Amino acid sequence: MRMRIRNQNNHLHFPVAEAGLSPTHFQADTFPPSFRKRITVQHDGIDTDLVAPKPDAALELDNGAKLTRDDEVVTFINRNLEPYRGYHIFMRALPELLKKRPNAQVVMLGGDETSYGARPPKGKTWKQIFIDEVRDKISDQDWTRVHYLGRVPYDRFLSMMQVSRVHIYLTYPFVLSWSLLEAMSAGAAIVASDTPPVKEAMVDGETGMFVDFFDQVSLVEKTCKLLDDAALRQKLGTAARQHIVDQYDLKRTCLPKHLEWVDQLAKQPVLGPDQFIS
């Protein structure tokens, strides 16, 4: 019943819709065939001129310290830190990652609310729930290398991506995060969950490395592999950026296609009420 109620908006609008737009095939393919055939897949686009590698980038932490590309920085981003985007998996892998990487600085970005999945018990946050779950497995000294930024202005987000040595992206089969594409555009080396929306944007071994969503051991192993191999990081990061420039560039690819879609739609004859597909 809950799902039917959530779908009512689409059911009310699609019978009178002549066309639809979806940023990904994964999202478009969630619609019934009668709706899907009218949906054009075209991503919003990434400003690859703005979101680009920056060798002299620096990220200032809340404690005043600055991280640069000379530091071993591991990054993780959610709009809000929650299980739907793999926060719990990342946190459960964190104790072992910190043990194996004594010089790593782990930087996490995201709010304390809930964007997509189930809400935490009243009075709690998913962020703190999973901190509490793993904190006794992490020494006080190692915990000083874990940095929560909360929500930040866009320029600070960009700096975080530009200093990242390895970026970790995890998600259930759901809407693809724009931050993954921005990380690729920034030339980051990425370890990402082997889930359908991710596979639409990345190729394992070519533009990033895949890991089973629930496999914390493999997540740590592949992150360490990238941290140990500068040449592999460079190869994957360069290919990831080129893919975004070729397929997702806002100004040269996506925006022109959006305008073309609008122009073609405007040229179609206006349908009468009895001509729409139910």
Briefly describe each language-model feature range.
Residues 231-267:
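A charged, aromatic-enriched C-terminal amphipathic alpha-helix characteristic of glycosyltransferases
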Residues 151, 159-164:
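Short alpha-helical donor nucleotide-sugar binding micro-motif in glycosyltransferases
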Residues 114, 118-155:
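Nucleotide-activated donor-binding/catalytic signature segment of Leloir-type glycosyltransferases, i.e.
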Residues 21, 63-85, 91-96, 106-109:
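Conserved donor-binding/catalytic core segment of Leloir-type glycosyltransferases
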Residues 172:
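Aromatic "clamp/platform" in nucleotide-sugar-dependent glycosyltransferases that forms part
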Residues 189-192, 202:
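Short hydrophobic beta-strand element within catalytic cores of glycosyltransferases
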Residues 204-205, 209-216, 225-230:
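Conserved acidic donor-binding segment of nucleotide-sugar-dependent glycosyltransferases
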Residues 1-20, 33:
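Membrane-proximal helix-turn-helix segments that form the acceptor-binding/catalytic region
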